[in-house]
Amino acid sequence: MSILEGISSYIKDGESASHNLGLEIEHFVVDENGTQIGFGEISALIDSVGKELNAEIHYMDGYPVGYHTKGYTVSLEPACQFEISIDPYSDLKNIRTVYKEFRNTWDPVFEREGYHFETKGNLPNVELGLLSPGDIPLSPKKRYQFMNSYFNASGKYGKYMMRASASAQISVDYASEEDMVRKLRVLQKISQLLM
């Protein structure tokens, strides 16, 4: 199979009769000085809140690092960026409702601990030059240690991606290659407005 045939097959395999959108948002959790929450603290909060919600708690290497509950999944990224992955919905109202419920759950928890969400693409203290990405500790997930070793040997921007970036990502169902191309063209045009 050629590369072109492989790509074509991959696109064909992704076709769906549904018309859903998925949304993932990574957040920085910082104190008033812009310092990120530590792994031990956020892991304990995930365990506590997950149990209060009767959620299915996810563990990695023995640590609570996320949970799944009705409508969404929470997980930790390499430097404790806090991600919500909202289940796919066909209605933006449902996505908004789930995100509000997530924020209504977590905003008071973090506020009580002296933290708040920052929803920016770059960690503000790094962007301001107050902190170097190399100074930000990684969570103890083994895979992040492997990624870190690779990025340290392969260039200078991997540590920024792992430690000092957060993103929002959407997934869009498509019915055919033509439908996918049409939706990608629209998304490319509006992406500049969303940044």
Please give the residue ranges for each predicted region.
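Terminal catalytic/cofactor-binding subdomain
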Residues: 1-156, 164
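Internal, well-ordered domain-core segments that constitute the primary functional module
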Residues: 142-195
